[in-house]
């Protein structure tokens, strides 16, 4: 079968790093090609070379059988290559239709925008995705998951021959994911080629026909998905066997460190639980169940309307994140790029940002040597892959960005560490490193709350698990009691089992 798109022998270097070396990718008509690899393997760089954002140093790009070079995203888009980025690229103040057709609005014979036609065309695109809202709605009023579906509708509006999807389900619900897969199958039947970039093994084996593996900027293999298992694919990605993906540390927790009684706030109703020293408490539940809201009320980022929180036996009132930090409660956001990191600043500046008090003299000036020493220690401890601590953090892979975000929280020497979706968008190799770090914190007596949508992660890492449903606590389970079936029953409200100490 002739490829619609073929990249061969692609090299790309940046100062101090060879991002791609002999990389290759084929996209076939009517098939979905998964592109997988650890963060930093070169997947994003390859997409930027393909769409013309980066100029390749060596290699060839064949588009519909002809040697081609794209000058930028616009030329690749006009040629028939569409890309759905992991980061949303929408304007909240405009309607869905205005976002979809921005810069190419329909005009009537008088040169004015034909709003009726534009909304009708946009509504048809939304209907293809089985979405229930209309295109005259403002994008800013949509959930993150619905905004991602608008991004997909926008790319479909170009009638692209090849569509690149970069972690497209990262913010989608199961229903939205099912709708996306239905659309992908429809696109396949029309002879379009899909590049599907994802860390989610289940999705790759469900929707993809072929898979291309990158490792350290190099092409490792192209295989039919049907010939592989999850384990064999992961081993190709990381170059080693993965034993025990969730390395649980079986230490007995200590005395109660945090006690939450009848806590209420936006999206949180009458929640009570305890957390012990050296314990990992998993928080499970469906999207919108109130898990993140509970953590933000606890940390001080959202207002508490009633209830009590005690830390080491003393009542704590957190009216702001600063109060949370001052009391030893650190929250690592689920959205590290929006809430957790300053992408234009360096690794060092991001890591030490909340701990500057520890590196400040009485007059307010910084002890730069102390700061550099501490940052260097964390970079080594966390195995952060960066050319230097002065590197802009936005240039690091997702897994390394997440390590920096966690290190920043630990620099303030907290008593309670809240990790909200700590491995979202992180590859399997970096996940294992993060799990090992979490176990190290646990062994040191740190109390950890692990919020995750990945049930195997919650089940594998937690000592106890509580489940949220519609702002309430719907279940509490020991490690031995917890199964995927039990957690799901509690998450949908079919089971209510809460045993408080």
UniProtKB/Swiss-Prot annotation:
Residues in the signal sequence: none
Compartment annotation: Cell inner membrane
Catalyzed reactions per annotation: D-ribose(out) + ATP + H2O = D-ribose(in) + ADP + phosphate + H(+)
Class of the enzyme per the UniProt entry, highest EC level: translocase
SUPFAM superfamilies according to UniProt: P-loop containing nucleoside triphosphate hydrolases
Gene3D superfamilies to which the protein is assigned, alphabetical: P-loop containing nucleotide triphosphate hydrolases
Keyword check for Translocase: yes
All copies of domain ABC transporter, residue ranges: 5-241, 252-495
Membrane topology, from the record: Peripheral membrane protein
Residues binding ATP: 37-44
Keywords: ATP-binding, Cell inner membrane, Cell membrane, Membrane, Nucleotide-binding, Repeat, Sugar transport, Translocase, Transport
GO molecular function, one term: ATP binding
One Pfam family here: ABC_tran
Family to which this protein belongs: Belongs to the ABC transporter superfamily. Ribose importer (TC 3.A.1.2.1) family.
Subunit: The complex is composed of an ATP-binding protein (RbsA), two transmembrane proteins (RbsC) and a solute-binding protein (RbsB).
Protein name: Ribose import ATP-binding protein RbsA
Provenance organism: Salmonella choleraesuis (strain SC-B67)
Gene name in the database record: rbsA
């Amino acid at each position: 079968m002739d490829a619609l798109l073929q990249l061969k022998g692609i090299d790309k270097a940046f100062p101090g790093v060879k991002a791609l070396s002999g990389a290759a990718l084929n996209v076939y008509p009517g098939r979905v090609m998964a592109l997988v690899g650890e963060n930093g393997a070169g997947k994003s760089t390859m997409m930027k070379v393909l769409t013309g954002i980066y100029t390749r140093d060596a290699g060839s790009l064949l588009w519909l059988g002809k040697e081609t070079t794209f000058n930028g995203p616009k030329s690749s888009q006009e040629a028939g290559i569409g890309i759905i980025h992991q980061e949303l690229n929408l304007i909240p103040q405009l309607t869905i239709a205005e976002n979809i057709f921005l810069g190419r609005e329909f005009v009537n014979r008088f040169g004015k925008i034909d709003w009726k036609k534009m909304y009708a065309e946009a509504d048809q695109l939304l209907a293809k995705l089985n979405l229930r809202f209309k295109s005259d709605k403002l994008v800013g009023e949509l959930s993150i998951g619905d905004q991602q579906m608008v991004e997909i509708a926008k790319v479909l509006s170009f009638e692209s021959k090849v569509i690149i999807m970069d972690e497209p389900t990262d913010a989608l619900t199961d229903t939205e994911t099912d709708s996306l897969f239905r659309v992908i199958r429809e696109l396949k039947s029309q002879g379009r080629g899909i590049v599907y970039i994802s860390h989610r093994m289940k999705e790759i084996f469900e929707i993809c026909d072929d898979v291309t593996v990158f490792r350290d900027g190099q092409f490792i293999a192209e295989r039919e998905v049907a010939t592989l298992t999850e384990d064999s694919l992961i081993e190709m990605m990381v170059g080693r066997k993965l034993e025990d993906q969730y390395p649980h540390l079986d230490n007995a927790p200590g005395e109660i460190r945090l006690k939450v009684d009848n806590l209420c706030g936006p999206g949180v109703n009458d929640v009570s639980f305890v957390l012990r020293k050296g314990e990992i408490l998993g928080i499970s539940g469906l999207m919108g169940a109130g898990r993140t809201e509970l953590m933000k009320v606890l940390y001080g980022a959202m207002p508490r309307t009633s209830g009590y929180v005690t830390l080491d036996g003393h009542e704590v009132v957190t009216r702001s994140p600063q109060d949370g930090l001052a009391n030893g409660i650190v929250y690592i956001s689920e959205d590290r790029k929006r809430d957790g990191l300053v992408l234009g600043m360096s690794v060092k500046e991001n890591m030490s940002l909340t701990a500057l008090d520890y590196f400040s003299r009485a007059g307010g000036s910084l002890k730069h040597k102390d700061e550099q020493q501490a940052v260097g220690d964390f970079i080594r401890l966390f195995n952060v892959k960066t050319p230097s601590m002065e590197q802009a953090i936005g240039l690091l892979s997702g897994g390394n960005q997440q390590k920096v975000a966690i290190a920043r929280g630990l620099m303030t020497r907290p008593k309670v560490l809240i990790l909200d979706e700590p491995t979202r968008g992180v590859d399997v190799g970096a996940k294992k490193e993060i799990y090992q770090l979490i176990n190290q914190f646990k062994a040191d007596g740190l109390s950890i709350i692990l919020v995750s949508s990945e049930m195997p992660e919650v089940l594998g890492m937690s000592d106890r698990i509580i489940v949220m449903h519609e702002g309430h606590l719907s279940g509490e389970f020991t490690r031995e009691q917890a199964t995927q079936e039990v957690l799901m029953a509690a998450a949908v409200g079919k089971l209510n089992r809460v045993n408080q100490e």
